[in-house]
């Protein structure tokens, strides 16, 4: 009844205050963790999943190598919510060690956890996380691979071009291939390799993938892209030809204005 819920609320209040008190204590001298961080490690093993979640959040605020190593133990927690909190905390801490630990969560049996892991990788290291995000394209779930492509788009670095290019060519899902083709137009501006990948994408059996490739060629801003666009004008699908005609008009107008 009311007594139970008031007790739960009081526990949360006390726990939150305790965590706030711990953070400044532990934050002094990352190389020599104080007793506070060991208290958080103990709380991460508490029988109550809500306390374990709060402990993960606290470790994320504390940061440092010791917190990352403690959080790693939480990747095998039976609670989905706790594992997600652990991954988010690792993303918040960031750095190479955190990226390595987050990469282990790409094997989690929960699709939601694997998606959160891909997101946390971007938070943890942006460009340095690209090779690890690339591993997520081996996931059997389309939603995880779609999310990995979106995260590469968010990073936006030229190093994402060959990764997205490979996805355009080899992923078994036309939805994922189409997304990768679309994002190539955003990350591959004035990038000749992006033009090469998009040229090959025009041979894809899915008209949607070919349309996304044509739209991306319109953003590349290289004369070589115009030559590839001309191939789209000869496509067997009328929808693709119409889109190629529209994009070619926009590109030429910008080119010669």
Question: For each predicted feature, which ranges?
Answer:
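N-terminal, post-signal-peptide region of Sec/Tat-exported proteins
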Residues: 48-88
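Short inter-helical turns and helix N-cap capping residues of alpha-solenoid HEAT/ARM repeat scaffolds
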Residues: 47-48, 78-79, 109-110, 140-141, ...
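N-terminal leader/linker segments that initiate helical-solenoid repeat arrays
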Residues: 27-61
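Amphipathic alpha-helical scaffolding segments comprising HEAT/armadillo-like alpha-solenoid repeats
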Residues: 31-43, 64-76, 95-107, 126-138, ...
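Alpha-solenoid repeat junctions
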Residues: 59, 63, 90, 94, ...
